UniProtKB/Swiss-Prot annotation:
This is Protein Abitram. Keywords: Actin-binding, Cell projection, Nucleus. Actin-binding protein that regulates actin polymerization, filopodia dynamics and increases the branching of proximal dendrites of developing neurons. GO terms for cellular component: dendrite; filopodium tip; growth cone; lamellipodium; nuclear speck; nucleus. Belongs to the ABITRAM family. Interacts with F-actin. Interacts with G-actin. GO terms for biological process: dendrite morphogenesis; regulation of actin filament polymerization; regulation of filopodium assembly. Transmembrane segments: none annotated. GO terms for molecular function: actin filament binding; actin monomer binding.
Length: 193
């Protein structure tokens, strides 16, 4: 049996492929939908970000345009003591039905952030639901709030009522709508003398 040969056929040199793909989405971008509340309680630039998981859990964080995240701000301390009778640290949740969780409205304060320049910021819930947990790590390491606001520097975790889980996002902005608000705000301050 004669061996078949094809002398004209040559292997092409291997091609060098440069990866031009975008990096994979972060864990937060993969599993959470970002919602925003601009100018919370009518205070300009005090924007909050709500990360909503598919299981309806909401993680409350600061939006990138919040004054606390701007350069030059130094956080002096953070307090979950809302009033003399109310501390978010006393929230004790137990059981399948999350007994003992504090109920929050959209405007309920979660914590207060005190900056070294004397400014004080009250962070609100932005969603109705039960307070599952607060991030005690930011009490001891306030810099987490500025360094990793969407992950380790979150403020609190809120669980909306099941019946209200679809309506939670009413009144909140999508990522694109929020970016438009920030651009308009930037343009307005740039044109104002």
């Amino acid at each position: 049996m004669e061996e078949l040969r094809c002398p004209e056929a040559k292997l092409a040199p291997p091609e060098v492929v440069i990866a031009t793909e975008a990096p994979p989405p972060s864990l937060v971008d993969r599993y959470f939908t970002r919602w925003y509340k601009a100018d919370v309680k009518g205070k300009p630039c005090e924007d909050h970000c709500i990360l909503q998981h598919s299981n309806r859990i909401c993680v409350i964080t600061l939006a990138g345009s919040h004054p606390v995240l701007q350069s030059g701000k130094a956080i002096q301390r953070i307090s979950y003591q809302i009033s003399n009778n109310c501390s978010r640290l006393e929230n004790k949740v137990s059981g399948k039905f999350k007994r003992g969780a504090q109920f929050l409205t959209e405007l309920a304060p979660l914590c207060k952030i005190y900056c070294s320049d004397g400014e004080e910021y009250t962070i609100s819930s932005c969603v109705r639901g039960r307070l599952m947990e607060v991030n005690e790590n930011i009490l001891h390491q306030p810099s987490l709030l500025q360094e990793k606001p969407s992950t380790e520097g979150y403020i609190a975790v809120v669980l909306p009522k099941f019946e209200e889980s679809k309506s939670v996002t009413e009144g909140l902005l999508t990522q694109q709508q929020y970016e438009e608000v920030v651009v308009k705000r930037t343009n307005a301050t740039a044109t104002t003398p």
